[in-house]
């Protein structure tokens, strides 16, 4: 229910859902919640499933358009149109066709909310509707939000700075020109608060910012919240809209982005021998996560189960990666162990696949270490070849791609992969999507700062068989 809704008489609510025990048994409510929270102590973790998905991405708003783009092998990378990119080394990006008015945002929301927050809320609304949850039967205190972002409200902060400083010419800030919403832009935790407000979540609400693994880690944190019993429903995912002059210049300075400006559509080429950096992008994905038993009891459509998750830091270098892939391999092993999935049962790997020289080399080594010879039999692909790298959001978009791959039995391709690299010698599904029965898939992320995360997802049929 909305946060400002009037209290509802429990007797008038009719049948209750699996998320809210009958109010006439208050003591039993506490017992049920304690039972859920104590399952972990006895090795009976609550299983977590995805029952709703929402996507806003370059080349596609909503899961249908997103999936059509991924399976077509087309790319959404173009010359930057948001501003004149000619002064910059990298002049290409993957911009989303996002109209906040068409999305239903009113004047007050448009005035208050940064573009990244709008993406997150739009995705949360889509996921909520797709989940089939009835807001009137949810206990708001048992609903939470876990949102990730790498640069949060960078778009609005940069705009406000330009206004305050006369485009950088005046270094004295005149408070009279300051937007009354500057606080909303400055404090990253406003983003999950906006989502909580939109969906009526009064449970645990957290902000995750672990660079390019934020989208994986925010969902992983939400899984933990349900497993430990502190929430029954979590809205989880990530949003980033980093296509701004300062962010573009930032990655220019460290030579992380591509300089293939004369061929934007083919600029993002993970694992290709001619790769020269990633393509900056924007996007968001949000999920509704629930306890498996509760989702089953209400007859929900289960898209996938999140059966394992792990994250770690290599404590090595802010941007550098060791060529042997040891730390990422260990992260993968921990996720597989938690999932109780053997390496030989992984049917597809959704790679981080950023398109930088060192990352793709590092990943290839990690898959060989973690999966052994099975790595050579497993298709690996990078959707960044088509939708670019949306920093903190990409991990959630890649989870969405895995969910859709499991449901459709199709592996998305790695676009633009035409030139082999002897150090990247696995099956990277070049150019064309591939039909394949998928039961268990692995998705990984790697971020500046040494963050490395991995997640195992299972299809609904396999999840049911494991019950």
Swiss-Prot record:
The enzyme class is transferase
Query: Residues in domain Ketosynthase family 3 (KS3)?
Result: 45-459
Q: Which Gene3D superfamilies match?
A: 3.40.47.10
Q: In which pathway does it act?
A: Antibiotic biosynthesis; actinorhodin biosynthesis
In this protein, the active site sits at 212, 352, 389
> Is this entry keyworded Iron-sulfur?
no
- Ranges for the region named Disordered are 1-35
What is the E.C. number? 2.3.1.-
Name the domain of life this protein comes from: Bacteria
Q: Name one Pfam family in it.
A: ketoacyl-synt
Keywords, A to Z, come to: Acyltransferase, Antibiotic biosynthesis, Transferase
A molecular-function term among this protein's GO annotations: 3-oxoacyl-[acyl-carrier-protein] synthase activity
Which family is this sequence assigned to? Belongs to the thiolase-like superfamily. Beta-ketoacyl-ACP synthases family.
Stated name of the protein: Actinorhodin polyketide putative beta-ketoacyl synthase 1
Q: What is the lineage of its organism?
A: Bacteria, Bacillati, Actinomycetota, Actinomycetes, Kitasatosporales
């Amino acid at each position: 229910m909305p946060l400002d809704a009037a209290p509802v008489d429990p007797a008038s609510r009719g049948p209750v859902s699996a998320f809210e025990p009958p109010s006439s048994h208050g003591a039993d409510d506490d017992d049920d919640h304690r039972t859920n929270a104590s399952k972990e102590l006895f090795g009976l973790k609550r299983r977590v499933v995805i029952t709703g998905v929402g996507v806003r991405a370059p080349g596609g708003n909503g899961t249908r358009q997103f999936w059509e783009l991924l399976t077509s092998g087309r790319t959404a990378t173009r010359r930057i149109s948001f501003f004149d990119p000619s002064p910059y080394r990298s002049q290409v990006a993957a911009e989303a066709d996002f109209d906040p008015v068409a999305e239903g945002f009113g004047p007050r929301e448009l005035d208050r909310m940064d573009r990244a927050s709008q993406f997150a809320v739009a995705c949360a609304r889509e996921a909520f509707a797709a989940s089939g949850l009835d807001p009137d039967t949810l206990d708001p205190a048992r609903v939470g939000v876990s949102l990730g972002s790498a640069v949060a409200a960078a778009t609005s902060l940069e705009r406000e700075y330009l206004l305050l400083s006369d485009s950088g010419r005046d270094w004295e800030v005149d408070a009279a020109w300051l937007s009354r919403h500057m606080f909303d832009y400055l404090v990253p935790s406003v983003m999950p608060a906006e989502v909580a407000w939109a969906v009526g979540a009064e449970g645990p609400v957290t902000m995750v910012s672990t660079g390019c693994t934020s989208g994986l880690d925010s969902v992983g944190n939400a899984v933990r919240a349900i497993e430990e019993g502190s929430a029954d429903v979590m809205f989880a995912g990530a949003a980033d809209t980093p296509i701004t002059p300062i962010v573009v210049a930032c990655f220019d300075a460290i030579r992380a982005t591509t300089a293939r400006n004369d061929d934007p559509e083919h600029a993002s080429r993970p694992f290709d021998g001619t790769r020269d950096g990633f393509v900056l992008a924007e996007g968001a994905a949000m999920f509704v996560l629930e306890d498996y038993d509760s989702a089953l009891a209400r007859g929900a459509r289960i898209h996938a189960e999140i059966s394992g998750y792990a994250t770690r830091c290599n404590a090595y270098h802010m941007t550098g990666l060791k060529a042997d892939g040891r730390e990422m391999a260990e992260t993968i092993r921990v996720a597989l162990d938690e999932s109780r999935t053997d390496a030989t049962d992984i049917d597809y790997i959704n790679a981080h696949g950023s398109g930088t020289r060192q990352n793709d080399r590092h990943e290839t080594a990690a898959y060989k270490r973690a999966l052994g010879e099975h790595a050579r039999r497993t298709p690996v692909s990078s959707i960044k070849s088509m939708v670019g790298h949306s920093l903190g959001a990409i991990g959630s978009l890649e989870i969405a791609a895995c969910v859709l791959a499991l449901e459709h039995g199709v592996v998305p391709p790695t676009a633009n992969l035409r030139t082999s690299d002897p150090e990247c010698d696995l099956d990277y599904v070049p150019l064309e999507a591939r039909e394949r029965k998928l039961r268990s898939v692995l998705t990984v992320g790697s971020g500046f700062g040494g963050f490395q995360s991995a997640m195992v997802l299972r299809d609904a049929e396999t999840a049911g068989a494991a019950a």
